[in-house]
Amino acid sequence: RKHKNLKPFQCDKCSYSCVNKSMLNSHRKFHSSVYQYRCADCDYATKYCHSFKL
């Protein structure tokens, strides 16, 4: 798929498309209002685990 530029997984909220479902699931967090990663010491919260560092 990558070499043929096929992107069968399409976001239903924007024009984003990708080659696999896991990338689409990760992208869907962008549209979500849920911040599941929260700091225990302050008010910081994020949608993505890679943005959360101690």
Curated annotation (Swiss-Prot):
Location within or outside the cell: Nucleus
One annotated GO biological process: segmentation
GO MF terms, alphabetically ordered: DNA binding; zinc ion binding
Signal peptide bounds: none
Alphabetic keyword roster: Developmental protein, DNA-binding, Gap protein, Metal-binding, Nucleus, Repeat, Zinc, Zinc-finger
Family that this chain belongs to: Belongs to the hunchback C2H2-type zinc-finger protein family.
Protein name: Protein hunchback
